[in-house]
Structure formats: structure tokens, C-alpha cells
């Protein structure tokens, strides 16, 4: 009898824990750039557009809205600036979504007043705080975590102080096997592609630079 009661108690606990775990997903036009102060990666994101939460604490994501905008015979890719969205976790699954943008007019309206919706699986709206993330430095996407940390330390509208961390600038690199410490990176070029090549070349160690130069000579 004791064993049966213990088994039932364990089963109830497991059921309670399992029901508490929620999945945060996005609409097809929204991508996660950062989750709770960390850059979104395969270790954080279960699939392309989802991750798990197991508490009702405050959470924060940085998202980007992307749409193919068709106008006449041309199609253009729209990608929004990073948007910080802070919300309270729930025991339900959550979806983060953005309106469908079909025209340049929709895009301009969204740029002026971006609205990211957060709802539970049952359709209840989750209160949020959201605003654009200020982007600083060369290749701001590379400095996303640093920019987000500075934002969270600033006490801004959607900031979460506990997600502010002290980080070295990405351009400084790290030391260790196969790595070299980097100082200030200076780039020049006619276009973004050329500047990016210069940036990453200067970030690489000597062996990688040599391999790249040998490859480039063969092209």
C-alpha cells in the first residue's frame, strides 16, 4: 500500500512538472536573435523557431521580422531592426507573432510602430514591454549580445537588469588554441561584402588567414 501511494505521488509530481513546461514558438515571419540575454543558438532553440521555458519568471527575447514584399514585377526582402520583447512566462505554450506585411505601406507602418503579439495556447494575450534594440558598432548583429547587455543595464522600457552581463567586445576576440587576441579592427571597402571579408579576415588566426589567401589565389 505504501509503495502504491509513493508511486502515485511520484506520478503526480512528474505530471505536474511536465504540464508546467511550456514551448515558446513564433509565426513564420519572426526569428529569434536572442533569448534571455544570450544569442539564440542551437543549444537554446529546440527547432528553428521554438524554445522551452519551465517557469513563470520574466523572459526576454530579441526578434526580427522578415517578409518578402512584392511590388509589381519586383520582390524585395524586408528585415526589421531587432526588437526587444519582455514578457512573463506562463504554464501554457506561448506564441510570439507579427502581422503579415504585404506592401511597402504595411512595412512603413510597422517600422514606425512595430507590434509583436504574445499569446498563450488558449488565446489569452500576454502583457509585454517592447521596443527597438539600439544597434551600435560595426556589424551590429555580431555585437548583439553586447548591445543587449548594455540595453538591459540601462533601465530602458523592456530592459531586464538580471540579463545584463559584463562581456568583452566581440571585436576583441578570445585567446586560446587556434585563437589570437584582437585589438581594434579597421575596415575599408566599396560595399558591405568587402567590409565583412576584411573584418573576418582580421579576426582569424595566422594559419586560417594563410589558408584563405591560398584559396583566394586559386579562384
Swiss-Prot record:
Pfam families membership: DUF2057
Keyword set, alphabetical order: Signal
Signal sequence segment: 1-21
Keyword Ribosomal protein applies: no
Lineage: superkingdom: Bacteria
Keyword Translocase on entry: no
NCBIfam families to which the protein is assigned, alphabetical: PRK01904.1
Family, as annotated: Belongs to the UPF0319 family.
HAMAP family according to UniProt: UPF0319
Protein name: UPF0319 protein MS0844
Organism whose genome encodes this protein: Mannheimia succiniciproducens (strain KCTC 0769BP / MBEL55E)
